[in-house]
Amino acid sequence: MSKITSIATGNPVYGHSQDDLYSFADAVYSRDAIESRKLRFVYRQSGIDKRYSVIPDFSLPSAERIFFPDSPDLEPFPDLEKRMHMFNDTAADLSVKIITECINGKINASDITHLITVSCTGMSAPGLDLQIMEVMNLSPDLQRTSVNFMGCYAAIHGLKMAHAFCSAYPAANVVVVCTELCTLHFQKDISHNNIMSSLLFSDGCGAMLVQNQKQHKGFSLEHFFSQVSFKGKADMSWELSGKGFLMTLTGYVPELIKEDFDMLVSKALLSAGKTKQDITHWCMHPGGKKILQVIEESMELLPGKLKHSYEVLRNYGNMSSASIVFVLQKILHELQQNNQATAQVFGAAFGPGLTMETFLATYD
């Protein structure tokens, strides 16, 4: 059975407090004192203290910016080409750093047989997968694939592919790396979608090593389940435009999740022959404070059951597909610190569609 035997996570060097990010957004979005107070309120209610970015500008005086122009209206506003250049200049180095940490002490880089790159915030050909191969001097006959533009649930999709590779190749050493540079796509037009995106999203990278190794402690991947609710297809979307990627994220998304999530979990567990009582740890994508709250309410979870998701949201924001890797790593550290012999983990994430992906794993 395939097993996640190592996890590593990390962020770009520029950390920004939520207060600094509010100040940047306030200068862009607020037209008067009333709007400024409203914006400050939603930022302070976000449940986020700090986020990271490949862009230093969010905490700098306008004269010191390197990405956005030194102008009150941010014109000439960065186009898609400039944003993709920044992705190509920074994503590979961050990915290589985290992959190296992930495999350290487990395997050599030359032992990697499969590479799965996951991102919805940057694309090119040759892409991130080939950049990583070149920088790390990986085997030229390595099998690789890319999970592109699927959104926040894509890490679970990547794990499904890793599980399939391990099932087909007993000696497989699969690396799944989720690299998201969400802040590259900051938009200045005043809209609910842009304001919500500006207060939630962050940059981060998570890598996982998946192997058929029974002797190593880790998360044995047992079951996956996916379901799409098309009634929410207009409420969460991610589209390309000339000025960057555009996010649609309506206030109805938490209600959609609240309506369907408990039923989804029940169906996923039933298909795996499990019940809620079997689950010791819940690994939920920290898509936002309201989303975590409705999950707690709909599933009637005891306080503290989603503590790791809340912690990731507070310290890093929403890093799209990388977020759930951060949560899973925190669960792993807790189990290791407590010398726990075994645990049952249920994970779930959400994205455009509205798509809900889940996984079931045993720590052993």
Where are these regions (language model features)?
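Short, well-ordered amphipathic alpha-helical segments that serve as non-catalytic structural scaffolds
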Residues: 48, 90-104, 161, 205, ...
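A contiguous, well-structured pocket-lining segment that forms one wall/lid of small-molecule binding clefts
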Residues: 67-70, 82, 86, 97, ...
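Claisen-condensing/thiolase-fold acyl-transfer catalytic domains that form or cleave C-C bonds
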Residues: 96, 120-121, 139-141, 146-167, ...
